[in-house]
């Protein structure tokens, strides 16, 4: 176990002192150009300013978010805790698709939100022994340095690096979890841990901690009686912090939305013959424009496939008499964008397509206008308003004359959700509380007309969804995805005439 002696670091200077043991001086390795820059031999498990100066600015731990902001998040959480308490968060493990084929790593987002740590097989503990916030202890248990493993899997920051880079007060090898954790639990009265976690129930560390706390395994022998401990969930408490975005978070999300929106415009200007090609095109544009990856598995649904809300097969042929519904966006620095657009494969709306599309767009426009804190609307209030608006639009189209119709059948999903590190950020946040300044929500009404004889033939097998990301202000709002065109005249102009603005390819410094 290592214990921090030096004060908490909010710049990369102490990181440089640490790594000067490996390289001296660091400056001799730096270059003014990306192409000629010599790699600095710093052994860390994720990008740092020293290794990726074009991606991470000095003082930042992750793109756009400083070490100071991560520290402030931990302190805000500690302020809500009683003395003699600890929060335990189990990070995610590498997940395998088949045999040795693994999925890209995705960190448990509560742990990431509080630490910026993006390496697998780790546990974070935030301990508050007294009333004084200055006594708060930030523990990290992480994979130790291992030359053999790092040769095959990549560098690790290690037990020392998690202190010097990520400001952990105390750190230890994750291999010592069974000895380390009982000591902390024994000396605290309140244990905050999500026993019923749905985010990482397969994590080996989660299972170990759970068995320690519920007595289901043999790992609790080193514990004093757990019966006199109060065990409470923590994710809902963290969710209340996560739902209000800082200016830095909003800046990242605005950039992710901008890149994603411009990528959609690039797609509008091309004709595609199959869903997988359009899927791949958008993926390339998100990454080339500066995002890290897709924010989620995209929906690329042509024709009747669009009637499935979360269709992700993306393997069908696209015909000119159909529309395609795409729900896709990029992620930057861990923060998601979320965009849905629907457009005709032919490049021009038919009269029926135009009428249905305008109905959805009218509802979306009116709902976005409600996204101000001063209106005192909740997300549920906006949803109820969208139902009323959609009923009127359907009546205008004559669909109210269809026997047995109801708006819930044709518009079966919710108007939107919170957005952030998770694409649904975070489910535990109430839909019924008034929206607050700094929240980011999606507004995404939709219409899905089934292939049933009771509906006019020209409307059947058409699914339309239009979605944007909206940041709540006091008396205004900001559309974070405004670049993605959606007005019919604008769409047809791009589809038929292309784009006049150049898309910035192969971005290395998105922020």
From Swiss-Prot:
Entry note: cofactor: Binds 2 manganese ions per subunit.
EC top class named in words: hydrolase
Keywords recorded for this protein, A-Z: Aminopeptidase, Hydrolase, Manganese, Membrane, Metal-binding, Metalloprotease, Mitochondrion, Mitochondrion inner membrane, Nucleus, Protease
Residues the record lists as binding Mn(2+) 2: 327, 338, 467
InterPro entries: Aminopep_P_N, Creatin/AminoP/Spt16_N, Creatinase/aminopeptidase-like, Pept_M24, Peptidase_M24B_aminopep-P_CS, X-Pro_dipept-like
The EC number(s) this enzyme carries: 3.4.11.26
Pfam family, one: AMP_N
GO CC annotations on file: mitochondrial inner membrane; mitochondrion; nucleus
Family annotation (CDD domains): Prolidase (cd01087)
Catalytic activity: The enzyme cleaves the 36-Pro-Pro-37 bond of cysteine desulfurase (EC 2.8.1.7) removing three amino acid residues (Tyr-Ser-Pro) from the N-terminus after cleavage by mitochondrial processing peptidase
Chain segments annotated as coiled-coil in the UniProt record: none
Any one biological process term the GO annotation gives: proteolysis
Cystines in this chain: none
Requisite cofactors: Mn(2+)
Membrane topology field: Peripheral membrane protein
Binding site for Mn(2+) 1: 338, 417, 444, 467
GO molecular function: aminopeptidase activity; manganese ion binding; metalloaminopeptidase activity
Location relative to the cell: Nucleus; Mitochondrion inner membrane
Purpose of the protein: Aminopeptidase which cleaves preprotein intermediates that carry destabilizing N-ter amino acid residues after the mitochondrial processing peptidase (MPP) cleavage site and is thus critical for stabilization of the mitochondrial proteome.
Note: Present with 5080 molecules/cell in log phase SD medium.
Family of this protein: Belongs to the peptidase M24B family.
Record-given protein name: Intermediate cleaving peptidase 55
């Amino acid at each position: 176990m290592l214990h921090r002696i030096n004060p908490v670091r909010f710049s990369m200077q102490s990181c440089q002192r640490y790594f000067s043991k490996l390289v001296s001086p660091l400056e001799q390795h730096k270059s003014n150009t990306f192409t000629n820059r010599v790699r600095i031999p710093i052994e860390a498990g994720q990008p740092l300013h020293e290794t990726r100066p074009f991606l991470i600015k000095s003082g930042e731990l992750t793109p756009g978010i400083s070490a100071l902001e991560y520290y402030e998040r931990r302190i805000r959480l500690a302020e809500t805790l009683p003395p003699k308490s600890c929060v335990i968060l189990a990070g995610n493990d590498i997940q395998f698709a088949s045999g040795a084929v693994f999925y890209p790593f995705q960190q448990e987002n509560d742990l990431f939100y509080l630490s910026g740590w993006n390496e697998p097989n780790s546990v974070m503990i935030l301990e508050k022994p007294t009333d004084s916030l200055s006594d708060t202890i930030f523990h990290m248990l992480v994979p130790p340095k291992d030359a053999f493993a790092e040769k095959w899997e990549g560098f690790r920051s290690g037990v020392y690096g998690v202190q010097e880079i990520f400001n952990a007060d105390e750190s230890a090898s994750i291999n010592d979890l069974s000895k380390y954790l009982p000591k902390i639990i024994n000396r605290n009265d309140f244990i905050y841990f999500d026993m019923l976690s749905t985010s990482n129930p397969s994590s080996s560390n989660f299972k170990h901690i759970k068995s320690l706390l519920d007595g289901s395994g043999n790992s609790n022998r080193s514990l004093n009686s757990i019966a006199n401990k109060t065990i409470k969930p923590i994710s809902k408490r963290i969710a209340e912090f996560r739902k209000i975005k800082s200016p830095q978070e909003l800046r990242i999300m605005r950039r992710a939305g901008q890149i994603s929106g411009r990528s959609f415009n690039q797609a509008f200007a091309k004709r595609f013959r199959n869903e997988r090609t359009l899927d791949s095109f958008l993926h390339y544009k998100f990454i080339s424009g500066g995002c890290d990856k897709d924010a989620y598995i995209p929906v690329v649904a042509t024709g009747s496939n669009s009637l499935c809300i979360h269709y992700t097969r993306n393997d069908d042929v696209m015909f000119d008499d159909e529309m395609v519904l795409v729900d896709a966006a990029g992620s930057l620095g861990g923060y998601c964008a979320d965009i849905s657009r629907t457009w005709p494969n032919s490049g021009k709306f038919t009269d029926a397509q135009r009428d249905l599309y305008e109905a959805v767009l009218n509802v979306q426009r009116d709902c976005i206008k409600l996204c101000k804190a001063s209106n005192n609307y909740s997300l549920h209030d906006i949803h109820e308003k969208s139902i009323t608006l959609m009923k009127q639009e359907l009546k205008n189209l004559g669909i109210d004359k269809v026997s047995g119709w109801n708006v819930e059948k044709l518009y079966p999903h919710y108007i939107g959700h919170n957005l952030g590190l998770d694409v649904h950020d975070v489910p535990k946040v109430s839909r019924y509380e008034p929206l607050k300044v700094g929240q980011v929500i999606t507004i995404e009404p939709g219409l899905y007309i089934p292939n049933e004889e009771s509906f006019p033939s020209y409307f059947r097998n058409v699914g339309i969804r239009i979605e944007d990301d909206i940041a709540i202000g006091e008396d205004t709002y900001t559309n974070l995805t405004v670049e993605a065109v959606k007005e019919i005249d604008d769409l047809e102009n791009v589809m038929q005439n292309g784009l006049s603005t150049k898309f910035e390819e192969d971005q290395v410094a998105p922020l």
